[in-house]
């Protein structure tokens, strides 16, 4: 008998959620949202708000291997004064140059000035102007001790 072969091609478009709808979905079923949609929800809240941090925490939990999700969530930890949590997240992406400035700042705030200098220098050498500024400030602080 002859064998038949049937090939199918399925294409679909995923509808993007408007921000207000995404806010509701974030509470009920955040897995339906992309990382970008979560970011768009987060920026509707004040940076220092609980909701802003919560969105990035959810993103880091749902996208645990995404460097941007981890870096953003660590940044909210850093801004909130939770340097240990920031470092825990940043350690997972320590080879990503985008994380180096925040790692340096987190180590400085946690009191590990040697590691802070190491990461700020790496970031500055990689062309991060904020890291260069932070490194200068850290060197002044070390000199004044």
Task: Tell me the role of every PLM-derived stretch.
Residues 1-145:
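N-terminal targeting segments with Sec-dependent signals, encompassing both cleavable signal peptides
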């Amino acid at each position: 008998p002859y064998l038949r072969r049937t090939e199918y091609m399925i294409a679909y478009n995923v509808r993007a959620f408007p921000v207000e709808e995404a806010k509701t979905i974030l509470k009920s079923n955040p897995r339906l949202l992309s990382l970008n949609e979560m970011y768009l929800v987060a920026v509707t809240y004040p940076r220092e708000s609980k909701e802003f941090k919560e969105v990035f925490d959810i993103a880091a939990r749902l996208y645990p291997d995404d460097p941007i999700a981890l870096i953003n969530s660590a940044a909210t930890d850093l801004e909130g004064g939770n340097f240990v949590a920031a470092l825990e997240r940043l350690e997972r992406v320590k080879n990503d140059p985008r994380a180096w400035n925040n790692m340096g700042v987190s180590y400085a705030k946690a009191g590990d000035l040697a590691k802070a200098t190491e990461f700020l220098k790496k970031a500055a050498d990689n062309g991060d102007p904020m890291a260069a500024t932070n490194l200068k400030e850290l060197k002044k602080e070390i000199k004044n001790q």
